[in-house]
């Protein structure tokens, strides 16, 4: 089937597809801000240019659209026209996402992926609760490091002296 749009019309239509500040991203960003997390957006220096970067916790969050990133869910409806092109494109996107996640993890970053379908009205609260749990675990990992103080030598003797004698 021939394309019903001229190349100029197709270009104008495709150029309006947003890659930043999408509704799912804004939902996650507002929630993070209200929870007290501070972040940067679209840091170019990191592989994959993550949507949300929390440097303090070495955590990045990708908010992926189900169609563009090939999430196998009910929201992922592939076009029937030019199907091979779209399949190849989405496969390349998936491969790129896998490479970016691996590179970030190898560099010591925590990588979280939130899918568009997880933020619909039905699943949003559950998804944000799960995100809260995971971020809490990450924060605890970073704050529960080695103790910054040590016992004086004379205290170790006192503790031994207070223990009952062994028969």
Model-derived features: where do they sit?
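Nucleic-acid endo/exonuclease domains
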Residues: 1-113, 117-167
């Amino acid at each position: 089937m021939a394309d019903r749009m001229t190349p100029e019309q197709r270009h104008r239509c495709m150029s309006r597809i947003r890659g930043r500040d999408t509704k799912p991203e804004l939902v996650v960003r507002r929630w993070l801000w209200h929870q007290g997390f501070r972040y940067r957006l679209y840091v170019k220096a990191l592989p994959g240019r993550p949507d949300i970067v929390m440097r303090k916790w070495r955590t990045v969050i990708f908010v992926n659209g189900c169609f563009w990133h090939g999430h196998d869910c009910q929201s992922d409806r592939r076009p029937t026209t030019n199907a091979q092109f779209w399949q190849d494109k989405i496969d390349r996107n998936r491969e790129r996402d896998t490479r970016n996640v691996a590179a970030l993890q190898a560099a010591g970053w925590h990588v979280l992926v939130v899918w568009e379908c997880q933020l619909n009205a039905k699943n949003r609260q559950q998804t944000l609760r799960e995100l809260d749990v995971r971020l809490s675990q990450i924060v605890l990992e970073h704050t529960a490091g080695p103790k910054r103080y040590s016992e004086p030598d004379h205290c170790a003797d006192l503790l031994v002296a207070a223990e009952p004698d062994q028969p």
